Amino acid sequence: MSHISFKGCSFLSHLDSFQFDISSCQTIAASLVFATGGLFLLSRGLSFLRALFSIFILPGKSLSSFGPKGSWALVTGASDGIGKEYALQIARKGYNIILVSRSASKLSAVASEITSANPNILTKTVSMDFSENNDEDYEKLKDIIKDLDISILINNVGLSHSIPVPFVQTPEKEMKDIIAINCLGTLRVTQLVAPGMMQRKRGLILTMGSFGGLLPTPLLATYSGSKAFLQHWSTALASELEPYNIHVQLVVSYLVTSAMSKVRKASMTIPNPKAFVRSTLNHLGRSGGLFSYSHTSVPYWTHGLMAWGITSFLGAMSKTVLGINKSMHESIRQRALRKAARESGKKAQ
């Protein structure tokens, strides 16, 4: 009996030890979960502080660090909206301006506005339709700029869809125009300007990106793809030109009041061109809320916070973001189609 009792005690002893091991493992697992969660929250907290410092506190580089006053800035898509505002604000900082866009009359008006406000500033205008991708236009531009000290290039020219549209229904001309303007136009102008900057060992190249390139955007597939292309191209170019002391930066924006966005009223999340460009020029070299993307800036404060939140918690390429984007643009498309139907009905009457 005592022998049996001894074995029973031995079994109970092992059982207690086993239960203790399970309890210990559970405690360790819980500690690891809490530690991991704590590290995640700490990293996100530090990331948020970094974003706040970049957006609100740390100063950007001055334009004069990229080239002296009296040198030239070339701005594409300069006839109105963001491009016009870049030209006006850079001219006020003492740089001569080359205005490039399609409408000669609008370019002349912008040039007159610049010289009226800044009598010592020189301007040149180049009228060309980027959708044509015409070699003669680029040769003309090359001849005009060949002897100029261009220290700043603003790749602003761009085109989106007239309304959100499924890719298979996208008009062929619209599709080709978007690629010719957003991609080929930007590449060809940069290829004309960059060699001079490399010789002078200084310069600034800003290219307008978009949330549409950061986030895949259904019903704006061609536009979204063109802006995503610019994201990768600009970042790669930045690495190539960095040894020549040329700063290349993609500027990412959400909506800005403009003819292309079709938004007329400014709000906290949708600035007007003046406020957006001022923020961009004040944050040169700063990432805003998108520091996980090299050589990229989201300069306007609400856009920067939005970009930080999306990339930190949801993921720019996630199904959640994709679904939200799709629903939003499907709704915009339906409203646009209803508006077009109403206007067509009024004309028929």
Curated annotation (Swiss-Prot):
Belongs to the short-chain dehydrogenases/reductases (SDR) family. Pfam families: adh_short (PF00106). The active site is at Y223, K227. The chain crosses the membrane at residues 29-49. Keywords: Endoplasmic reticulum, Fatty acid biosynthesis, Fatty acid metabolism, Lipid biosynthesis, Lipid metabolism, Membrane, NADP, Oxidoreductase, Transmembrane, Transmembrane helix. It is a single-pass membrane protein. Pathway: Lipid metabolism; fatty acid biosynthesis. One of its GO terms (biological process) is secondary metabolite biosynthetic process. Its EC number is 1.1.1.330. Its main location: endoplasmic reticulum. NADP(+) binds at L74, D129, D137, N156, Y223, K227, V256, S258. Component of the microsomal membrane bound fatty acid elongation system, which produces the 26-carbon very long-chain fatty acids (VLCFA) from palmitate. Catalyzes the reduction of the 3-ketoacyl-CoA intermediate that is formed in each cycle of fatty acid elongation. VLCFAs serve as precursors for ceramide and sphingolipids. It is found in: Endoplasmic reticulum membrane. It catalyses: a very-long-chain (3R)-3-hydroxyacyl-CoA + NADP(+) = a very-long-chain 3-oxoacyl-CoA + NADPH + H(+). CDD domains: 17beta-HSD1_like_SDR_c. One of its GO terms (molecular function) is ketoreductase activity. This is Very-long-chain 3-oxoacyl-CoA reductase. One of its GO terms (cellular component) is endoplasmic reticulum membrane. It comes from Coccidioides immitis (strain RS) (Valley fever fungus). The keyword S-adenosyl-L-methionine does not apply. InterPro entries: 3_ketoreductase_fungal, NAD(P)-bd_dom_sf, Sc_DH/Rdtase_CS, SDR_fam. PANTHER family: HYDROXYSTEROID DEHYDROGENASE-LIKE PROTEIN 1, VERY-LONG-CHAIN 3-OXOOACYL-COA REDUCTASE.
